[in-house]
């Protein structure tokens, strides 16, 4: 909610000059302004409690305006034309096979009562476009959870492979059940290692795209970047799914003199305020 219009400010100034009653009226006015916002957030939270099954890693769509902002962010990040970026965004959104797989696999999973079946990709649309444009040979994601992001990234890699630019997704997660959404044909280009990211990152070869989405503690996040740093290719991208709450990627970008960009999510019809995409490029 923005600033009060000039007429409202004028009325407030007149009211506040009234002896005794003026400050009380202005305080009530301010409380009403805040309550309008709080009431809307409370309504969204109630609808989520009623309709959603999720307890963490919330999924949602972006607002139409925020989706356009994501497209603008991707133009800046990739150097691609806006028309190409928008085409790639629609490519993922219109992927009927992926949509059906996520829906049916979620309904059939042991976590069906803790997950919303209908896929909502939000910022992961950006991940997809980055893979389609930059065509990395090795994508590494620390932190897989059920594997929605893994499926999105694998879908991009499958298309790249069909176009003559093969690549592979490697997920790392300490939970042995992580990645249960991955199945054929996505497993043709994707696999998951179960273990501690800090123990496994040092064993990898050349990384073209690193995504931090594991333990969201800034020092753990920075440790992952430090371990991956000597293994990054000259053109590697490094993305943080926690940049809305941590400055670790920004500190890494400054230390390595890499370009840093950030996109902030605005979820549509959800009480959660959203995460974002923190991205560093050479």
Regions flagged by a language model, labelled:
Residues 45-48, 60-64, 100-105, 113, ...:
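Short amphipathic alpha-helical segments, especially helix-boundary/capping motifs
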Residues 15, 73-77, 88-91, 101, ...:
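Residues that form generic nucleotide/phosphate-binding pockets
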Residues 1-2, 209:
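Intrinsic low-complexity/disordered segments
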Residues 80-120, 132:
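Class I SAM-dependent transferase core
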Residues 10, 68, 83-90, 96, ...:
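Generic alpha-helical secondary structure signal
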Residues 11, 113-118, 124-282:
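S-adenosylmethionine/decaboxylated-SAM
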Residues 2-79:
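Membrane-proximal basic amphipathic "stem/tether" segments
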